[in-house]
Amino acid sequence: MNDVIRDFFKMESAGGILLVIAAAIAMVIANSPLNESYQAVLHTYVFGMSVSHWINDGLMAIFFLLIGLEVKRELLEGALKSRETAIFPAIAAVGGMLAPALIYVAFNGNDPEAIKGWAIPAATDIAFALGIMALLGKRVPVSLKVFLLALAIIDDLGVVVIIALFYSGDLSTLALTVGFAMTGVLFMLNAKNVTKLIWYIVVGFILWVAVLKSGVHATLAGVVIGFSIPLQGKKGEHSPLKHMEHALHPYVAFAILPVFAFANAGISLEGVSLSGLTSMLPLGIALGLLVGKPLGIFTFSWAAVKFGVAKLPEGVNFKHIFAVSVLCGIGFTMSIFISSLAFGGANPDFDTYSRLGILMGSTTAAVLGYFLLHVSLPKTAAESEKAIS
């Protein structure tokens, strides 16, 4: 289908391996004598923010910018162009947020402190999910990759809204006003057919700063910028959107995502007890991710097709959808972020055990999701092409 996406995921397969290696190294370091140095580096302040915040709010905004570009292009000229195919991942994402939250509440609804973490298993870590899928290379149909892209970004946008509504203590009205104004400027540039990317970069940077200062998760700015970049260039010009995609791909695949994994995967197991590990909090999170995610995504997807609201993407069957739904149980970094908002300051023990629940659920979902994809996909790239044609 689209050579740009194929090239991206071909390169991403190597990036996916780096992602897993970086996460594994971080876990080893966090549980070794080097943990103190590891934490010290991440919490070192540079230009008013810690290194960890620069990675999660700065570098990851670039990743979300790339995702915004990918999804916009697919909506306009690719696999999500029709209403039926575009609505499919949106419905799946809604199910993928509702079911995990309900499972968590079933385990922790009677605890007034633990209930604050109800949104923790509702998240999907798009970076890790894409990295695991990319390990299977060209065996994965392009349409299935696009489905995961769209589902995960809608899921993450939903979580951003949840954070803004339920976990943002002090929202800055001034910063939000500037953010909305810059969003308007970006789409005005698009409407006026401005194709020079420098204008989008300058205004987008101001938007990112405004969103960062507003109290809302700064990565949302990357998505907005991505959707504002024009797909069509002026006569005789290349597509600005595709040009930016090509420019960002190697940096995202081989630098940003591995650094992101290294900075976020280091969870210390010091002081952890078996009774704490099997308590309602970590179990609710782990089962929310491992059971709730696939239950919600698959059920809503099946119902959407069954009742004629949407249709399956080309070359994709329900075995593939179920495998991807399990893969979406990798909540990891976005879940950890919500955990820190819910428990970090007031209850460090809750924060520790919630992170372990996230780790248990996400790791199991990653292994099981990879296995299910491996056995359900065509054995070769050629067979995958034949299934689509």
Curated annotation (Swiss-Prot):
Lipid bilayer topology: Multi-pass membrane protein
Top-level taxonomic group: Bacteria
Subcellular location per the Swiss-Prot or TrEMBL entry: Cell inner membrane
Keyword annotations of the record: Antiport, Cell inner membrane, Cell membrane, Ion transport, Membrane, Sodium, Sodium transport, Transmembrane, Transmembrane helix, Transport
UniProt catalytic activity: Na(+)(in) + 2 H(+)(out) = Na(+)(out) + 2 H(+)(in)
Assigned GO CC terms: plasma membrane
Described purpose of this protein according to its UniProt entry: Na(+)/H(+) antiporter that extrudes sodium in exchange for external protons.
Family statement drawn from the similarity comment of this UniProt entry: Belongs to the NhaA Na(+)/H(+) (TC 2.A.33) antiporter family.
Protein name: Na(+)/H(+) antiporter NhaA
Organism annotation: Vibrio vulnificus (strain YJ016)
